[in-house]
């Protein structure tokens, strides 16, 4: 009408503020570890990808060529940052990733390893609940490193050397490369999960601003060779 108008505004950004790269101070084997806990308000989206090609020569028999001989896991984790300092630290970490370029270690945040007995300060063998690792364990990327989160907030990272049969059918033993230097009961661990070498699976990450100091982010990640 003569008193109501509707318009669509498009803004050009004349200049952007440079974001300083900020790498994680937690490292394992000289590679940063991303230990920020995800926002588990919904299930993690996960799918398995393989570098496979179907070879069909028209003779009636087809073959599959799996280049990597292993699956690559793609997961999408949600994160919630609740203040400006957390947001600034995340944006600095994101800049250090350079999209898909720079890899990092990331806990799977899955309860894959459940201890059942106390481990002593000098021991390198942990008794865990049976998950079939002794039977099906294969030293492949994503199953050779583990992350241990103690109830005091300290992270420990270890290389898994082997799995073996336990004293009962409900247990297995997991050998790690280094002892913890302290006694630990099963309830002393907040989380124990596999540690995967990972990279972002996108070059651009959308940051969803809820307010001027609260943002939500969904990070697609893809496992890589360690």
Mark where each language-model region is:
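Extracellular/virion structural assembly segments
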Residues: 1-226
